[in-house]
């Protein structure tokens, strides 16, 4: 009986420690601190630019803006969604104070999934000093990788800092130095036309989009973007969809009977990119909102002269 109680106590202690480790991430993410700075070689400010440092062919990308959600308050449904989702994706092997600490907090995180156990993280900590529990340092290209088991690496000379599975971090360095193809080669021209700030964004390119999005038996698009934000002027929520269509498809208008949300606007570009903005004061309606996908119907009339 005593041994069973010891086992239960050990499991409970491990569970509580895990919660504390994860919780500590959010405790210091937006905290202030001293004015210590780190040396940075290159700096990017916007997640749209982060894709230019991202190695080609990820499965998908997720972006979280903690500075944005802090303006909404913790009880806001959009802020709650962002915090809850992000908390699931920040692994304790990296994002605990025993491993990584940022002196002035974290404002943005972009998570790039390549199908590995540990993804690639782009973490905007400004120019803050970084404390990482490294076990070794190695040179890769012109950068220093701080390394720890099991296969985790961090580059602090970039802003956003790059951390994650060591082979992916090495590829990211190669991408920064122009020695590996960039995901931005395929997506930046689309992302740069999606205006505004976002609390959360999800986007993907290539075969995975063709598998996810179908119109009948066709795969109409090779790029997909979904983003959420708050319109502070109208006190309402917005969802933005963007797709790059390969065929004769585009986002079309809706009449009042077709949509169950307040505001709808579309913009179609000549190269096949379509952007739709859906807005409502009710967050649930925005989550469920979808744009109208239409196709051009082209017909040819063949006439024959009768003699």
Curated annotation (Swiss-Prot):
Domain of life: Archaea
Location within or outside the cell: Membrane
Main location (coarse class): membrane
Bilayer topology annotation: Single-pass membrane protein
Cellular component terms (Gene Ontology): membrane
TM ranges: 12-34
Keywords: Membrane, Transmembrane, Transmembrane helix
Name the record gives this protein: Uncharacterized protein AF_2048
Organism whose genome encodes this protein: Archaeoglobus fulgidus (strain ATCC 49558 / DSM 4304 / JCM 9628 / NBRC 100126 / VC-16)
